[in-house]
Structures are given as structure tokens and as C-alpha cells.
Design a protein with these regions (language model features):
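Alpha-helical transmembrane segments of multi-pass inner-membrane proteins
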Residues: 10, 17-25, 43-48, 99, ...
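Loop-to-helix entry and N-terminal half of a specific, functionally important transmembrane alpha helix
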Residues: 244-246, 366, 385, 392-422, ...
Length: 463
């Protein structure tokens, strides 16, 4: 193939330079002079170069930094044709594209068995997009769900054995350094100045609850790193990680997120009962010690008051949740029970069916109620099938790594616990970390159940 003449190359370069020169002022104007927005384009170019160089390296870098991404991504959003687009959406697109290309390059590693319930849930969600009262919001929500599946599938290409699972664990642990440091800064600047009674730590995340759920995941993986014989830590790293755990627990308390407290306590209780019962006494003392903290005590005592139904201001958060769940479920008509009202419908119709909404589009704060309302009984059945299949697969990991299997199943249980009281499906960064860990654990489990396929690659891989 003959290369183009020098004149053509020169002319093409001049046209590209002219186009870039004309576009830059328009780009700067669209970014409203914001330094962060102006840096979005160079950052996008770096992502594109990494995408061409090594897609798995790009995915690892995204996961390493995504926990601190909400601060930046929120400031890069711009309105184009009435649709809000930001750098975060472009990163999501890269993640989905990475998964597509990984599967296309090596389809034999695609986890068919666990992908079936995922596909059922995504199909139910896609039907929900078609029925959605707000198409733009529904498409964004669906792309978020699709990115969770993309991260989960990518783990099967990232992890080829127990060694890679350890790398995945370390990656998530390292991702917590920036949020932890930022949280300490936030505490020093705002918490101590205004008092801790009404202070809720959110760090780099958009809401304290998301930070709390992320911390429970990091604490779980810290436990694995400290106790697993598969991870060899130097004395210095072991000391640092051991000191890091109490810091994370302190940050978790400062989020004031009760469901995360319950999930974290349940995880450590299960670990103590199954692995090290000598710590049971310390575990029983932990709630009593936590109640000595004024903010924790107030959050717990708050559940005993404000249960009368008058208005949102006079309801505690749990009583308010019970009310919105009841009104939402009672509003579902029998003909809408199979397929629901469409993706994003609960939030859209909340001011209609919930008399205490005050005109605010509240989320369900319970993904089981949300899925039943939006995707119907079929969507909820697909969701239940997905988690049942995951539980079945993760049990097999115990043959390879008993503690690793416990950590993965505990993460599954944690996810189900917090899903009963929050809008977990909307928390993108947290979900990415959950699904990369679950995908990595499933990859380890499946790698041990297909020895014949490993010996004879022509017969396929993880199915």
C-alpha cells in the first residue's frame, strides 16, 4: 500500500491544525473558563492513548482513581442540546467499550453461566427504558447498569488466577487513600469548626451514605489482606494496614450511616464466628464503645422518636422510609405488576403517590421496592436470580481460598443489606468496586472448575 504524497499529508495536517484552532476558542467558551473543565479534553486524550496502549491498564487506572472522581466529574458537566454531559459519562463509555472489546478478542473467557441472569436483568431494564416517563434519566440509569455489568465481565479478563485476585484486592485498597485523606481534611476544616453533632462525613463522594458503603467494602478487603496467607505483607505494610483499619472505622462512624454500621458489624460478627472466636468478646464490646460517641448515640436514639406520621420533618429516616415504601407499593396497579412503570418511574411519580414528598422527587431508598415498582415482578425475579447464581458460584471459591470465599459472600450479603434502605443502584463508583471484586472472585472460582478446558483451550473457557 502506497503512502499518500507529501503534499497531501501537509494539506491534511494544515486542515487538522485549522480545525483545532477554530475549535479551541469554542471549547474554552463552552467550558465557561473553568480550569477543571478545560483539563477535561487533555485528560480524555490521555484516556484514549491508554485505551490504545493497554485496555486492562486503563481499567486498572480508572478503578484506582474513581473513588475520588465525583469531585471532578460534577464540575465538568455541560449542557449540550438540553442533555447534561460530563467527563464521568465519557469514562463510563470507555469502561463499557473496554468490556466489549475484551469479549470480542477472547470470547472463550466470557462467563456465560453468570451472564445469563445478568442478561435477564438488563433486558428487563431495557424494557423499562422503553416504558420510562423520563427517557433521558432512564437512558442514563441504564448505561450505569450496563457499566456495572461491563466491570463485572472485565474482571474475568483481568483475573486469571488467585494471584490476580490479590492484585484486585490491593487495587481497591489503594483507591481508598485519596478519599481517606480528603475525609480527614474535610473533618479538620468543617467538622471541628461546626461541631460533630450534625456533621456527616462524605469525603470525595456526593453523599455520606455512598462513602460509608465504600468504607465497609474497603474494611472487608483490609480484613482479607491482613488475615489471608495468600497475601504476603512486609512488616511495615502490615503495621500500616493494621493502623489504617481503626482510621477507616472512625471515618465510617463519622458518616452517620446506620445501615453501613449494621452491615459492617454483621460482616465482622460472621468472620469472628467462623474463623476467630477469641475475638467475640471484643466484638460484643464494640457497640457499647461506639455508643459513647455522642453522634452515634444520637443516630441510634433517633430511631425511637419521630415515628408518628405528620410530615417529613417529624419523621425519623426509618419511619419516613416505611411510609414511602408503603405508599409506593399500594400505588402499583395489578396490570403494571409484571413489568412495572418503567426505569426511573418511582422517583418521577413520588410526588404523585407520596403525600409527604413536598413536591420532591424522592428515590425509593430500597432497591427491592424500586425494582418491583419500575421493572415489575419479572425484573425483581431476574435480580433475585442474579444474586442466587452469584452465591452458588462464590461457594466454589472455598475450595481454592476459604477466606476469599467468605469475603466475596460477605460482600454479597452486605450489598443485600444496604440495598434494603438506600438507592444503591444509583451509586456508580461504589457499584464498580463491588462488581470488580465479585467478578474477580467468580473468575477464581470458575478457573478451578474447568481443568479440562484449561488443558485444552480449543474447547472453550469459562462457561
Amino acid at each position: 500500500m502506497q503512502s499518500p504524497p507529501p503534499a497531501v499529508l501537509t494539506g491534511g495536517a494544515l486542515l487538522v491544525a485549522l480545525a483545532v484552532g477554530l475549535a479551541l476558542p469554542l471549547y474554552a467558551q463552552a467550558m465557561s473558563g473553568s480550569a477543571v473543565r478545560l483539563l477535561a479534553l487533555p485528560a480524555l486524550l490521555v484516556l484514549a492513548i491508554l485505551f490504545l496502549y493497554d485496555r486492562l491498564v486503563l481499567l486498572a487506572l480508572v478503578l484506582l482513581l474513581r473513588a475520588a472522581g465525583d469531585l471532578v466529574f460534577e464540575t465538568t458537566r455541560v449542557e449540550i442540546g438540553g442533555l447534561a454531559i460530563g467527563f464521568g459519562g465519557l469514562v463510563n463509555a470507555f469502561v463499557i467499550l473496554i468490556a466489549v472489546l475484551l469479549v470480542a478478542a477472547r470470547p472463550e473467557r466470557f462467563p456465560t453461566r453468570v451472564a445469563a441472569p445478568w442478561a435477564a436483568f438488563l433486558i428487563a431494564a431495557l424494557i423499562g427504558v422503553g416504558m420510562a416517563p423520563n427517557l433521558g434519566d432512564a437512558v442514563r440509569s441504564y448505561l450505569g447498569l450496563l457499566s456495572y455489568f461491563a466491570v463485572f465481565v472485565s474482571a474475568f479478563y483481568f483475573v486469571r488466577g488467585e494471584g490476580d485476585f490479590k492484585v484486585c484486592v490491593k487495587l481497591v485498597l489503594l483507591s481508598s487513600l485519596l478519599p481517606a485523606a480528603y475525609g480527614l481534611g474535610e473533618l479538620a476544616l468543617h467538622g471541628l469548626a461546626g461541631g460533630l453533632q450534625a456533621f456527616r462525613l462524605k469525603s470525595t463522594f456526593s453523599h455520606p451514605n455512598i462513602f460509608a458503603f465504600y468504607l465497609t467494602l474497603v474494611l472487608l478487603l483490609s480484613l482479607y489482606a491482613l488475615k489471608s496467607p495468600a497475601i504476603a505483607l512486609t512488616p511495615l505494610r502490615r503495621t500500616l494496614l493494621t493502623a489504617y483499619v481503626p482510621l477507616l472505622l472512625g471515618l465510617l462512624l463519622l458518616t452517620q450511616t446506620r445501615s453501613a454500621w449494621v452491615a459492617c458489624f454483621a460482616i465482622f460478627a460472621l468472620y469472628t464466628l467462623l474463623f476467630e472466636r477469641r475475638y467475640l468478646v471484643y466484638l460484643l464490646l464494640a457497640p457499647a464503645l461506639a455508643l459513647l460517641v455522642p453522634g452515634v448515640r444520637e443516630r441510634v436514639l433517633d430511631l425511637g422518636s419521630g415515628n408518628e406520621v405528620v410530615q417529613y420533618a417529624k419523621l425519623n429516616s426509618f419511619a419516613w422510609r416505611l411510609q414511602i415504601w408503603e405508599y409506593g407499593l399500594r400505588w402499583i396497579r395489578p396490570e403494571n405488576l409484571p413489568l412495572g412503570y418503567g426505569l426511573g418511574a418511582f422517583k418521577h411519580f413520588a410526588p404523585v403517590f407520596f403525600p409527604y414528598s413536598g413536591g420532591v422527587n424522592f428515590g425509593a431508598h430500597n432497591i427491592y421496592v424500586q425494582i418491583l415498582f419500575e421493572l415489575g415482578a419479572l425484573g425483581l425475579a431476574a435480580f433475585a436470580w442474579l444474586f442466587a447464581r452469584l452465591f452458588s458460584m462464590l461457594r466454589r471459591m472455598a475450595v481454592v481460598d476459604r477466606l476469599g470465599a467468605f469475603v466475596a459472600i460477605a460482600l454479597l450479603i452486605e450489598y443485600l443489606i444496604i440495598s434494603a434502605s438506600d438507592n444503591v443502584l444509583a451509586y456508580l463508583a461504589f457499584n464498580w468496586y463491588v462488581w470488580i471484586v465479585l467478578g474477580a472472585a467468580c473468575a477464581v472460582a470458575l478457573s478451578r472448575t474447568a481443568p479440562v478446558a484449561a488443558a485444552r483451550p480449543t474447547q472453550g473457557g469459562t462457561t
